[in-house]
Amino acid sequence: YFMWEKIMEFGKEFQIQPYGTEALSTLRIEMGHVAGSELDGRTIPYDASLEGLVSKKKDFIGKRSLNRSAFTSTDREKLVGVVPIDKTTSIPEGSYIVKDPKAKLPNPKLGHVSASCWSVEYDNPFSLAIIKDGKNMIGQKLFAMSPLKNKTIPVEIVSSHYVDPEGKRVR
């Protein structure tokens, strides 16, 4: 307890604030930073907007694989953001993203919601999803369907970088 008090005292001039793991998770989702739920073993750097981390000059393990046809397909699932149209309904993690919720089964899914939070910055729910042709779907109105929660939520596809997309706050 003594150490905690001292840290808070010394940090006053820097306006430090304590936070927990849930706050850390919310920050990562709002910023579009990927974690375990987005990295499922099928995801490559280009799917998660991490192409800047892939060397164009140096050789590395897996470089040759990135040029295989399965990884260069234009309709690969990509990381995007998802916001409910009504700005109030939370989107359950694991929900399917579909064009038409009334389509005959099996309803062709475009992807799935990987993480959800309440955006403190914008005061509405926000989710990350991995969907086919993701970057070209930004601005589209689709549906998030959760069979487990028996919910169908009209959503809009947005950038995965919901808060501070230019990265000005971290500089």
PLM region descriptions:
Residues 1-171:
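Conserved, structured C-terminal
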